[in-house]
């Protein structure tokens, strides 16, 4: 029977992580469990930085961005001996289960603890990239989307004033959800998504045609890692003549107070994670699909499941611009 659980956040931070921690802590306490916080992710676990949490430990955190537990990337966790020590540390505290909030790398860590040591782990999807399989939305995505749209709105004001072409680089790694949705909401004229490839010549020709038809400014939304946006800006300006500037939104997308959607999603998922542990589940990851909370085998989710590309959204965008 589970009596003690721990919670950690790992990888890149995302708005709503604090709400998820709060939900795990308070749901666990309401069920009579002891709840512990692991500081700075798997690195903190390896360094035995674990602290018992109370109801008041998570007061006034639901509206705060980031994660008060801290987060860190810890590549050493790939080493079997490091994972073994982490499992020993959890057992030394009498901890029976672990809730991991993070992205795919965090899930992999939870998967290995479950596979190798039989340690009950539940994964919650916390990343602005919305690239975790088994869920329609990840914690932090909606807030990051609002941040990106706000930036696009501001860039449109100044781009229109100066007849400028603006390139906006948006996070997401190999998933274009954030880029496509921000572009639709922000009225961007062009979208460059990694799933469909990038043809620079085709993009420039489209811009040239738009300018020839009377367009005086434009905004291009592009997912990070597709190309060097500053070089692209120079290439476009050299061809079309209009001043062209690239803006990399970067880590500003990870910050800020989480929106209501992310607070509610994180709260629901956190409570659900505790319920799953009490039901005897382990090695599961939580998601939301068609507005219903679901759970999947964490190993299957990482190895087999794939997130669908929003091709229908991209087709919508083509008819709007």
Swiss-Prot record:
This is ATP-dependent 6-phosphofructokinase. The gene is pfkA. Homotetramer. Belongs to the phosphofructokinase type A (PFKA) family. ATP-dependent PFK group I subfamily. Prokaryotic clade 'B1' sub-subfamily. Allosterically activated by ADP and other diphosphonucleosides, and allosterically inhibited by phosphoenolpyruvate. GO terms for cellular component: 6-phosphofructokinase complex. Its cofactor is Mg(2+). It catalyses: beta-D-fructose 6-phosphate + ATP = beta-D-fructose 1,6-bisphosphate + ADP + H(+). ATP binds at residues 12, 73-74, 103-106. The active site is at 129 (proton acceptor). Substrate binds at residues 127-129, 164, 171-173, 224, 245, 251-254. Pathway: Carbohydrate degradation; glycolysis; D-glyceraldehyde 3-phosphate and glycerone phosphate from D-glucose: step 3/4. Gene3D superfamilies: 3.40.50.450, Phosphofructokinase domain. The lineage of its organism: Bacteria, Pseudomonadati, Pseudomonadota, Gammaproteobacteria, Pasteurellales. Keywords: Allosteric enzyme, ATP-binding, Cytoplasm, Glycolysis, Kinase, Magnesium, Metal-binding, Nucleotide-binding, Transferase.
């Amino acid at each position: 029977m589970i009596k003690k659980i721990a919670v950690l956040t790992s990888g890149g931070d995302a708005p709503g992580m604090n709400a998820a921690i709060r939900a795990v802590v308070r749901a666990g306490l309401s069920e009579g469990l002891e709840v512990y916080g692991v500081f700075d992710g798997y690195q903190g676990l390896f360094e035995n930085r674990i602290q018992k949490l109370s109801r008041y430990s998570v007061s006034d955190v639901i509206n705060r961005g980031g994660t008060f537990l801290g987060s860190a990337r810890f590549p050493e966790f790939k080493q079997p001996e490091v994972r073994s020590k982490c499992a020993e540390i959890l057992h030394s505290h009498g901890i029976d289960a672990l809730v991991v909030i993070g992205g795919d790398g965090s899930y992999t860590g939870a998967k290995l603890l479950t596979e190798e040591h039989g340690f009950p782990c539940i994964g919650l999807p916390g990343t602005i990239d919305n690239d975790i399989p088994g869920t329609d939305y990840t914690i932090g995505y909606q807030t990051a989307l609002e941040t990106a749209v706000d930036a696009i709105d501001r860039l449109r004001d100044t781009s229109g004033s100066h007849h400028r072409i603006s390139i906006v680089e948006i996070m997401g790694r190999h998933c274009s959800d954030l880029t496509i949705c921000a572009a639709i909401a922000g009225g961007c004229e062009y979208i460059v998504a990694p799933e469909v490839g990038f043809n620079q010549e085709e993009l420039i020709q489209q811009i040239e045609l738009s300018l020839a038809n009377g367009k005086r400014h434009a905004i291009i939304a592009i997912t990070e890692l597709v190309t060097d946006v500053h070089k692209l800006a120079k290439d476009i300006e050299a061809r079309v003549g209009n001043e062209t500037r690239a803006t990399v939104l970067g880590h500003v997308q990870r910050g800020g107070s989480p929106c209501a959607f992310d607070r509610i999603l994180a709260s629901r998922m956190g409570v659900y994670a505790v319920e799953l542990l009490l039901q005897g589940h382990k090695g599961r990851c939580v998601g939301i699909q068609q507005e219903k909370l679901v759970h999947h085998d964490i190993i299957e989710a990482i190895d087999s499941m794939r997130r669908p590309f929003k091709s229908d959204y991209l087709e919508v965008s083509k008819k709007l611009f």
